[in-house]
């Protein structure tokens, strides 16, 4: 995992037991999973809108910014569920060399 993701995962984990007013992430944890999921949904929509705008303008700066927000809130969700981002990277590694059609068929068969 990249240093950036590792460092972020450590920070997110450290915020779990912090006072709600000590940081944005701590406040999300205290508000609960539904609030985290609400933020994740908002960031998903903002990323989609930024991508549509970038397709017209050719400027992807907002897509990068919104994708960072999306990844960040995805990592907050994973941490809230007791999962580490390495699990996602491991899943992506597992998929290398596996065609998308085969991977989807394997999921459907389960």
Swiss-Prot record:
Gene (UniProt): hisE
Known pathway: Amino-acid biosynthesis; L-histidine biosynthesis; L-histidine from 5-phospho-alpha-D-ribose 1-diphosphate: step 2/9
Classification of source organism: Bacteria, Pseudomonadati, Pseudomonadota, Gammaproteobacteria, Pseudomonadales
Keywords: Amino-acid biosynthesis, ATP-binding, Cytoplasm, Histidine biosynthesis, Hydrolase, Nucleotide-binding
Principal place of residence: cytoplasm
EC number(s) from the headed UniProt entry: 3.6.1.31
CDD domains, A to Z: NTP-PPase_HisIE_like
Listed SUPFAM superfamilies: all-alpha NTP pyrophosphatases
UniProt key word Glycoprotein: no
Annotated source species: Pseudomonas savastanoi pv. phaseolicola (strain 1448A / Race 6)
The protein's name in its UniProt record: Phosphoribosyl-ATP pyrophosphatase
Entry-linked Pfam families: PRA-PH (PF01503)
Similarity remark: Belongs to the PRA-PH family.
Localization: Cytoplasm
GO CC field: cytoplasm
GO BP annotations listed: L-histidine biosynthetic process
Catalytic activity: 1-(5-phospho-beta-D-ribosyl)-ATP + H2O = 1-(5-phospho-beta-D-ribosyl)-5'-AMP + diphosphate + H(+)
GO molecular function, one term: ATP binding
Protein origin, superkingdom: Bacteria
InterPro entries (UniProt xref): HisE, PRib-ATP_PPHydrolase-like
Keyword Hydrolase: yes
């Amino acid at each position: 995992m990249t240093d950036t993701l590792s460092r972020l995962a450590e920070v997110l984990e450290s915020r779990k037991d912090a006072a709600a007013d000590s940081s944005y992430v701590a406040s999300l944890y205290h508000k609960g999973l539904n609030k985290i999921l609400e933020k994740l949904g908002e960031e998903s929509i903002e990323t989609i809108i930024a991508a549509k705008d970038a397709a017209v303008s050719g400027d992807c700066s907002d897509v990068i910014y919104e994708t960072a927000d999306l990844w960040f809130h995805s990592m907050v969700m994973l941490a809230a569920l007791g999962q580490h981002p390495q699990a996602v990277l491991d899943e992506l590694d597992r998929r290398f060399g596996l065609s998308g059609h085969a991977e989807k068929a394997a999921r459907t068969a389960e």
